[in-house]
Amino acid sequence: MMARFIFLSFFMLVGALAPTKAQNSFPYPALPDSLRSVEQRAAYLSEHYWDNFNFSDTQELANKEMAEQGFVNFIDILARFDQEIAQKGITAFTAKAYQQKPSKEKFESLIEHYYENPESPMRNDRVYALFLEDMAKSPYFDETEKERIGFKLKQARKNLP
């Protein structure tokens, strides 16, 4: 009887902890089965990558496994897409990420960290310039910020062909 109680308690504990573990990983979008070509799947993933992420949840923003690792994976795949698909993904991302100040600050700092650091393995001036172009057009940045962004964009473009 005691063994049965311990066994059931163990499974109840595992069941209670399982949702917590699942919430600590980035909520990737599911690709529709109707998308057959690589280009269609890439475009969908680029534009819908952030659909399940709650930008207003400060706990998700502070969670490195969700916000930072999700962002790192996002910029990694953007570098593999052509410019048009990458730009659509960045536009979809910034439309959501910059609406709230905490998420704007978080992701702006991650963009700087991964793209401005010359030692960063994620550094990619082509993708960085796409982020900066989108930020320069965004209504969520004031004129002073846009001036700084314009300078960074000019510097990033120097390394492009």
Whereabouts are the PLM-identified features?
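Bacterial Sec-dependent N-terminal signal peptides
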Residues: 1-25
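Oxidative protein folding and maturation machinery
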Residues: 23-161
